Amino acid sequence: MASTQCFLHHHALSTPARTSLVRGIVPSLKSNQLLVCRAQNKQSAPQQDNVNSVSVSRRLALTLLIGAAAVGSKVSPADAAYGEAANVFGKPKTDTDFQTYNGDGFKLQIPSKWNPNKEVEYPGQVLRFEDNFDATSNVIVAITPTDKKSITDFGSPEQFLSQVDYLLGRQAYSGKTDSEGGFESDAVAIANVLETSTAEVGGKQYYYLSILTRTADGNEGGKHQLVTATVNDGKLYICKAQAGDKRWFKGAKKFVENTATSFSLA
């Protein structure tokens, strides 16, 4: 009856030393050790030790080599946050939440789930995209002639906004009223400038404004409107992206901010 014995050999030794029989567990190997398995006959082990030693099968040897390689190598786990698919093959991930739009003299990133709309609200409007499920979340681009050489010729960002306040919507009601919610008498709409900044991109000055507008009858708690503006070749370029206040804090902020800040001259 045949049995299998495994011996651990050190390359430094001229005569291999026999180790005890390993049953069911393959020992860990160092780089200067070799695992040799020999088939022996139980009935005549001493006589057959030097004569009838048989190497393990190719399949077993291959299995041992693969196992040793796996132990000796470092495998980097696929990166994946909770709820995201693992990048198993290491290919770079692309942001599918946005699509690049190249217009006449400008470009920007638009949320992939927003659809084009032909509605025109503002002078010189050349583009409008809106959320599939909520038209309040949208972006427009308007291009109008100007005699200004730079956006800074309009004054400060706040002074510029006062000259294009039609972007925020005009108050249509002109009667007597006292509305709750911090509105002045006879006013049913209010706009608060939350943030302004300037930047130079490609040698051109840009204004960036973040505005919160509220109306007395609004059911969204107001609108967050982000405006990016610049001047080039006698044209005033304005990009305005917005979302309702409630949706702003439920995920719309990411899409509106990325859209407005991605706008630039082409």
Curated annotation (Swiss-Prot):
Q: What span is annotated as the signal peptide, if there is one?
A: none
User: What's a single GO CC term here?
Assistant: extrinsic component of membrane
InterPro entries noted in UniProt: Mog1/PsbP_a/b/a-sand, PsbP_C
| Organism domain of life | Eukaryota
Q: Which Pfam families match?
A: PsbP
**GO molecular function, a single term:** calcium ion binding
| Gene3D superfamilies per the UniProt record, alphabetical | Mog1/PsbP, alpha/beta/alpha sandwich
Q: Where in the cell is it found?
A: Plastid, Chloroplast thylakoid membrane
Name a biological process GO annotation. photosynthesis
* Protein role: May be involved in the regulation of photosystem II.
Query: Per its record, how is this protein called by name?
Result: Oxygen-evolving enhancer protein 2-3, chloroplastic
This chain's source organism reads Nicotiana tabacum (Common tobacco)
What are the top taxonomic ranks of the organism?
Eukaryota, Viridiplantae, Streptophyta, Embryophyta, Tracheophyta
* Gene this protein is translated from: PSBP3
